[in-house]
A protein has these predicted regions:
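Glycine-/small-residue-enriched transmembrane alpha-helix faces in small-molecule transporters
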Residues: 1-34, 135-167, 253, 294-302
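Hydrophobic/aromatic residues within transmembrane alpha-helices
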Residues: 27, 35, 90-91, 116-118, ...
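C-terminal-most transmembrane helix of multi-pass membrane proteins
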Residues: 40, 244, 248-302
Length: 302
């Protein structure tokens, strides 16, 4: 029953993403490049197993026939590597609060990409949200003299990754496998370079730490698979509302469990961002109710 509920799958996938900081507490101070290398190396056998389990029979010839998607996978995996390295750095260096901010503002970056590249028109609620988010980031710049760089990098990179994936025609497991294969040479070079330079920790780590390195693959991929199943069986409104669960959990973990520094400046900054997002959430709910009412009257929703 759980697997048939799109809403529950969406909530579960974002819940898993939200609690990932707990996992990365087991790998404190590890270099993001080493985590990237290990994640790619272990993702490939995991994805091959998933494809076998799902009886995915996409052949090399079919993949090669769509060269546009093949090249887009190269672009998307490059962007995702930046996003993931930034994310893992924040997880392993007590910067979960900034990661939380990054994911709170990701939807606003997605809106901007739609406006710039797809010529979409901003709704009044989206305009208001952007103003409040800019005010929140600007307030930190004014008070601290610097921007929340990690948050901005994570938010923009993840939004760009999602934007690029819209144009990839492969199914999820095929595209994820191709993305991993594109990064495989980089992962192998990184592994040997880090080990030879003495900066790598995998070969000298204890058994528990090695297992944690291996688990970076399922910790990254399983929520994504649940999320994809959710998208196919629930409304975009539900997805749009559920996406704020992840940064909310990360925020609560950072402040109340990890005791990260949360002063008045960050309080004002986050409050402005939350206020802006509230306009987007209310707009989503209003749009959903409006379409539901139209459907009840036999009018085609827009």
């Amino acid at each position: 029953m759980f697997l048939r509920s799109g809403a529950m799958l969406a909530i579960f996938s974002y819940f898993l993403w939200g609690i990932t900081p707990l996992f990365y507490r087991l790998l404190p101070g590890v270099q993001p490049l080493e985590l990237l290398s290990q994640r790619v190396l272990w993702s490939i056998p995991l994805l091959l197993f998933v494809r076998f389990f799902l009886k995915n029979r996409t052949w090399v010839k079919a993949v090669w026939a769509d060269k546009r998607s093949l090249l887009l996978c190269l672009l998307s995996t490059s962007v995702m590597a930046i996003s993931w390295c930034t994310f893992t750095y924040s997880m392993t260096h007590d910067l979960v609060l900034e990661a939380s901010m990054g994911y709170f503002i990701t939807p606003l970056f997605s809106i901007l990409l739609g406006v710039i590249f797809l010529h979409e028109r901003l709704k009044p609620a989206e305009k208001t949200a952007l103003i409040f988010v800019c005010a929140g980031v600007g307030y930190q710049l004014y008070q601290y003299g610097s921007l929340p760089k990690l948050a901005l990098m994570m938010g923009s990179a993840f939004a760009l990754y999602g934007f690029i994936r819209k144009f990839i025609r492969y199914d999820l497991t095929t595209s994820l496998l191709i993305e991993s294969l594109w990064l495989l040479p980089v992962a192998i070079v990184l592994y040997f370079w880090l080990e030879n330079s003495g900066a790598g920790t995998f070969s000298t780590a204890d058994t528990v730490t090695r297992i944690c390195f291996i688990l970076t693959a399922p910790v990254t991929l399983l929520p994504l698979l649940f999320f994809t199943a959710a998208v196919r069986s629930t409304t975009l409104t539900t997805i749009g509302l559920a996406q704020y669960l992840e940064p909310t959990i990360q925020f609560l973990l950072a402040v109340f469990l990890f005791n990260e520094h949360f002063d008045a400046v960050k309080g004002v900054s986050f409050s402005l961002i939350w206020l802006g997002l509230l306009f987007c959430i209310l707009s989503l709910i209003r749009h959903h109710w409006k379409n539901t009412a139209k459907a009840g009257l036999g009018i085609k929703p827009r």
